[in-house]
From Swiss-Prot:
Pfam families: HECT, WD40_RLD. Its main location: cytoplasm. Pathway: Protein modification; protein ubiquitination. This is Probable E3 ubiquitin-protein ligase HERC4. The active site is at C1025. Residues 730-1057 form the HECT domain. It comes from the Eukaryota. It is an enzyme of class 2 (transferase). One of its GO terms (biological process) is ubiquitin-dependent protein catabolic process. The keyword Secreted does not apply. It is found in: Cytoplasm, Cytosol. The keyword Metal-binding does not apply. InterPro entries: HECT_dom, Hect_E3_ubiquitin_ligase, RCC1/BLIP-II, Reg_chr_condens, Ub-ligase/GTPase-reg.
């Protein structure tokens, strides 16, 4: 051991020497053949811990700080600690803390401000005593200020006690001192790697390099850009991105070491202790310029000096106050910048010459500083081992984190047989949000040091793998312990406000734990976890949403699926029956799960759909609740102003309506909602008509009205007649049920006539003779024609007709692209829509965007124009102002494509589509419609192709002589199921007027087959309006096959009968 500095009280342990000041490193004979584990330096005393766990002290003992009454000039053993294996020590001005290998803390010395944590009344304690209030807590680090103390537990809890004159306890301004350890609750949840204390200021360092400081700040030693004391922990923002891995404090200054080996200092600089070649104080962290060319691996602070070790040269550098020789430079001069400590230093990596004697050179193992003294543990070049590197943490001094080594240790014990200490270790780890927040860090490329509001610093793949490795069926005791710790300790302690982004990580990682997905844990773990998440304050929730938004889609989906499963589980319980006494808690559970999904859905929409929107659909909803009743309840809640935007506690008294969370509804459920809404509006319109009719009996000025919207049309003038009636129709009448009457026909409209009307009028309106729509051969789709001579009223009528069809639950045959439905739902068409409508043009645009070279102008020769046909002639339209003079290049090609798409779908047809849009929404507008996705709305208007032919057979009804087991019916279905897909689709077209099925599926498509007279020579006949098939009584399978195929092959148009 080398030592230098103030020896006036014997604090260097050199024995009875004459000098009171040792100006340069001197060997201590006492430590020959002894290995030192740790050194603590007080103002006038020093404590040494040897590798065998014994403790020796020397120096001033006026206040009992040595823990013994022996010689003060040379190290003497503290016999009271003989039975303990001490692993670390720390010294205040005149008090000492010692930590044993069991995590217990012993204290002695001055106790004027309660800095020993013993809750005693004595001024000083001369023999070490155990701090009993910490005896049940496993402490891994201790740190002493002059009159206060800090401790870090294995569970990432920070305790403080002693003087609080300057706020150095971090407990607020109210208390002056604490005589027993107090938990700093404001830091709960943060994963810490170090605690440090200065004269009257304190620091904690997180695993990802964030620093929190509090206490005295007269000289800027907290680095917070001012000189105001802090009574609660404050984040040192300026160092967050610097990868700080170690921090140490002097009386009024602070030094921080980075992962790259840089050093920052701040605070008091009056003696040059900051190393910036000045005596100025620094209120912000500043890098020590003269050390920037070297990689520093160790730093230490004395009262008013600083030391740094550079392993590449093997040298120790020091700066600051030198009046007591503490710089080791051979003089008492102060140094304002790093200066080499005198000595024959030898680098561990250096080549050892044969002629170097072991007595002549020193290979540094570790440096220590405190008070006005400094020490260096060294070895000879011949026996030199690698020096300590403060950039690498000692696992024994760190908090619990879930890692491969720990899991391997836990799994190494046979199931049900691991010792109590292992159970305590598992319990401690999973009872602490700080420990979980320090687990699964993204260590590759030191990514976790970038933790912030946009990046979590977590390796989610590691979290998934380690959780699945830990939770295994053949180790049920571990799973039970983890579940119990989460349920009873971790989750109940969660709060809505969090001290830092690092305290949020477990909200990201815990859903990866298989226990969360176990339905047995839904009400005890998953839902309480969700409640804590939902109750987060706005700022931390926003950060969590940011983190979710950059997750890999499968990881994001995992969280969504978890809470969908919770919702389904709860709805199943509800269907079975919930006792009235449990209804309130059930409501809160269901609200919680749905609220979490709502937040996730918001994130998904904000990010442009991280996962497909339909991944939020809960398809079981239709089976588990009465959607119609749920919608009615929701409408009533809206009418009475019930607000479901507040916290879960308040929601417990509000019945859950799934309609409040419409993103969980699939297309079928939304269609049911729309139909329910339509029925309600129809009923309201009918009721209003009835009230008006009753009033007209007593008040002749009030005209009677029809409760239905009646359309009387002639087949030969169906468009003109319909337009005439609809032009005169009031908006409120569109909400009435539609009844259609064909002039000269007696049929009562029970739905079939209405269906026929829609089929006929849409066929007529889309006829090329009107020139309203342009037909695209490549895609077989139509779009609004900007060359039409028709009045916009006709487009308005088509919009009304489409709206009426939906409102009256009828499929219509429209060959529009998906872009139409996007625009109806206020979504922007994209290049994909252009590819659908105009495949060749769309492909060309994609080729333009994908072209890798820079010579786009020369290769494509394009400008911001579009060439269109105008009655046989071509016309050039500018897409932007001065488009003809604006060439398309690599920089603006995306703008060109966007402008092209905008012209086709928006600008060129704006007035026509606006008329269509107004007509459509006049009938069918409202909140429910906006719940649909474009492809869902398309499927509802024109049907879809999700065929289930067995379901069609199952739901078919029979009339006359037929029943399901009739021989003709049996061979009919045999023939039908043997038909190829295209023939089956032709059959649908033949029978229903469309080869597509309603969005509600085959179960909603009711076919009727009835027997007819005549022989087997007759063909089957379809009554399209009623989905009715007249089927002769065929007896031979082949005959039936031929006749059926003949009938559907010769079907033209809609085959209406």
């Amino acid at each position: 051991m080398l030592c230098w500095g103030n020896a006036s009280y014997g604090q260097l342990g050199l024995g009875g020497i004459d000098e009171e000041i040792v100006l340069e490193p001197r060997k201590s004979d006492f430590f020959v053949n002894k290995k030192v584990r740790d050194v603590g330096c007080g103002l006038r005393h020093t404590v040494f811990v040897l590798d065998d766990g014994t403790v020796y002290t020397c120096g001033c003992n006026d206040l009992g700080q040595l823990g013994h009454e022996k010689s003060r000039k040379k190290p003497e053993q503290v016999v009271a600690l003989d039975a303990q294996n001490i692993v670390a020590v720390s010294c205040g001005e005149a008090h000492t803390l010692a930590l044993n290998d069991k995590g217990q803390v012993y204290a002695w010395g001055l106790d004027s401000d309660g800095q020993l944590g013993l809750q005693g009344s004595e001024e000083c304690i001369r023999v070490p005593r155990n701090i009993k209030s910490l005896s049940d807590i496993q402490i891994v680090q201790v740190a002493c200020g002059y009159y206060h103390s800090l401790a870090l537990s294995k569970a990432s809890e920070v305790f403080c006690w002693g003087q609080n004159k300057y706020g150095q306890l971090g407990l607020g301004i109210e208390c002056q001192k604490q005589t027993s350890p107090q938990l700093i609750k404001s830091l709960l949840g943060i994963p810490f790697m170090q605690v440090a204390a200065g004269g009257a200021h304190s620091f904690v360092l997180t695993l990802s390099g964030a620093i929190f400081g509090w206490g005295r700040n007269k000289f800027g030693q907290l680095g917070l850009n001012d000189e105001n004391d802090r009574y609660v922990p404050n984040l040192l923002k300026s160092l967050r991105s610097q990868k700080i891995v170690y921090i140490c404090c002097g009386e009024d200054h602070t030094a921080a070491l980075t992962k790259e080996g840089g050093v920052f200092t701040f605070g008091a600089g009056g003696y040059g202790q900051l190393g910036h070649n000045s005596t100025s104080h620094e209120i912000n962290p500043r890098k020590v310029f003269e050390l920037m060319g070297s990689i520093v691996t160790q730093i230490a602070c004395g009262r008013q000096h600083t030391s740094a070790f550079v392993p590449s040269s093997g040298r120790i550098y020091s700066f600051g106050l030198g009046g007591n020789g503490q710089l080791g430079t051979g003089s008492t001069s102060n140094r304002k910048s790093p200066f080499t400590v005198k000595g024959n230093w030898f680098s561990y990596n250096g080549q050892c010459p044969q002629d170097i004697g072991s007595e002549d050179y020193f290979c540094v193992k570790r440096i220590f500083s405190g008070g006005d003294q400094s020490f260096s543990h060294y070895s000879s070049p011949q026996s030199c081992g690698p020096p300590d590197d403060f950039r690498r943490s000692d696992p024994s001094k760190q908090i619990w984190t879930v890692n491969e080594a720990l899991i391997q240790k836990w799994l190494s014990y046979p199931s049900g047989r691991f010792p109590v200490e292992i159970a305590n270790e598992i319990d401690g780890t999973f009872s602490s949000s700080g420990c979980l927040n320090g687990s699964f860090l993204a260590v590759s490329n030191d990514d976790h040091y970038r933790t912030g509001t946009r990046f979590s610093g977590v390796d989610m793949n590691a979290a998934r793998l380690l959780f699945h490795r830990l939770i295994q069926p053949d180790h049920p005791q571990i799973s039970q312990q983890v579940a119990a710790s989460l349920e009873k300790n971790l989750i109940p302690k969660l709060t809505s406000s969090l001290p830092d982004v690092e305290a949020l990580r477990f909200y990201l990682t815990l859903p990866e734990c298989p226990l969360m997905s176990d339905c047995n844990n839904f009400t005890t773990i998953a839902i309480p976890f969700g409640t804590a998440l939902v109750n987060l304050e706005k700022a931390p929730l926003k950060v969590l949403e940011n983190w979710w938004s950059v997750l890999e889609p499968p990881l994001f989906l995992k969280i969504v699926e978890l809470f969908k499963e919770v919702v389904v589980h709860l709805l199943k319980l509800y269907k079975i029956g919930i006792p009235p006494s449990e209804r309130r808690i059930f409501n809160s559970f269901l609200h919680t799960a749905l609220k979490v999904l709502e937040i996730l859905h918001r994130v998904n929409e904000r990010t442009g759909q991280l996962i497909q929107y339909d991944k939020f659909y809960i398809h079981e909803v239709q089976e588990l609740i009465d959607i119609r009743n749920d919608y009615i309840n929701w409408v009533q809640q809206q009418a009475y102003g019930v607000d479901v935007s507040h916290g879960i506690t308040e929601l417990a008294d509000i019945p859950v309506t799934i309609c409040t969370y419409p993103f969980v509804f699939d297309a079928q459920a939304k269609t049911t909602l729309l139909q329910t809404d339509a029925v309600l509006q129809m009923q309201m319109a009918i009721d209003q008509a009835h009230r008006q009719n009753v009033s007209s009996l007593f008040l002749p000025v009030i005209e009677s009205v029809n409760p239905c919207l009646i359309l009387v049309v002639r087949r030969e003038n169906i468009v003109g007649d319909a337009m005439e009636v609809l032009r005169k129709t009031k908006n409120i009448d569109y909400k009435k049920p539609l009844k259609v009457i064909f002039v000269g026909e007696d049929a009562v409209d029970a739905g079939g006539v209405r269906k026929e009307f829609f089929l006929l009028i849409m066929r007529e309106l889309l006829d090329p003779k009107y020139g309203m729509f342009r037909y695209y051969e490549d895609s077989r789709l139509i779009w609004f024609s900007d060359k039409t001579f028709e009045d916009s009223d006709l487009f308005h009528l088509i919009g009304v007709i489409c709206g009426l069809a939906i409102y009256n639950f009828t499929i219509v045959d429209l060959h529009f692209p998906l872009a139409l439905y996007k625009k109806l739902l206020k979504r922007k068409p994209s290049l994909d829509d252009l590819k659908e409508l105009m495949p060749d043009v769309g492909r060309s645009m994609q080729q333009l965007l994908d072209y890798p070279e820079d010579d786009i102008e020369e290769t494509f020769c394009l400008n911001f124009t579009i060439t269109v046909e105008n009655f046989g002639a071509t016309e050039v339209k500018e897409l932007v102002l001065n488009g003809a003079d604006t060439a398309v290049n690599k920089q603006n090609r995306q703008e060109f494509v966007d402008a092209y798409v905008d012209y086709i779908f928006n600008k060129s047809v704006a007035s026509l589509f606006d008329a269509f849009h107004a007509g459509f929404h006049k009938v069918c507008g409202g909140k429910v419609l906006l719940l649909f996705q474009p492809n869902e709305l398309q499927a509802m208007v024109i049907g879809n192709t999700n065929y289930d032919w067995k379901e069609l057979e199952k739901n078919t009804e029979y009339k006359g002589e037929y029943w399901a087991e009739h021989p003709t019916i049996k061979i009919f279905w045999e023939v039908f199921h043997e038909l190829p897909l295209e023939k089956k689709k032709q059959f649908l077209l033949f029978l229903t007027g469309s080869d597509r099925i309603p969005i509600l599926g085959m179960k909603s498509l009711k076919l009727v087959i009835q027997s007819t007279g005549g022989g087997e020579s007759y063909l089957p006949v379809s009554h399209t309006c009623f989905n009715l098939l007249d089927l002769p009584k065929y007896t031979e399978k082949e005959t039936l096959r031929c006749k059926l195929i003949q009938a559907i092959d010769h079907n033209e148009g809609f085959s209406l009968i």
